[in-house]
Structure formats: C-alpha cells, structure tokens
Amino acid sequence: MIKFYYNTAPNPAKVALFLEEAGLPYEPVPVDTRRGEQHSAAFKAINPNAKVPVLVDGATVVFDSNAILLYLAEKTGKFLPAADKRGEMYSWLMFVASGIGP
C-alpha cells in the first residue's frame, strides 16, 4: 500500500487531492514539521531533503509534490491529457511550482 507522508501545507494537499480523486488506497502518515519531525534520521532516510510530501509505493520513493503528481498520473493513467496536450500541462505544473507556489 502507498504511504503518504504529509502535513497540512498546500503542496501535500495537492497530493492528497489526487489520491482521493483517483480512489487510490493509501496510508496517511502525518509529519509534524512544527516539531521538527522531518529532521529525524528515520524521515531523512526516506527524504534527505527533510521536506513533505513524500510518497512511498513499495520500493519506489518519490518526493516533491509535482514529482509525486506526475508519478501517480503515469502509474494510474488518470488526469493525464492526451499526449499532444501534455506540454501545456507540464508548463502549468512547473509554473505553479516555481512561479507562484509556496
């Protein structure tokens, strides 16, 4: 089962929305970043950047909300536009990540 490490910030919320809308079963794992749980050795073994969100799918570990969204879209085939429209989707996804994201 997918493990989803998160807090209540906007970037983990994007991933939570995808998981819910796709109907994927997952285990939510809250990370209290206000208390510094992301800096624990156990968490840094999963994500050396010490940030949420992180998705663990079997032996596959993906961090960064947009990387997770793309991984899940490719894995499930959901929410992906036709190949000739993906460039526009990638452009907007990266713009949100680097242009207006938190």
Language model region names:
Residues M1-P102:
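GST-like domain detector, emphasizing the conserved glutathione-binding G-site
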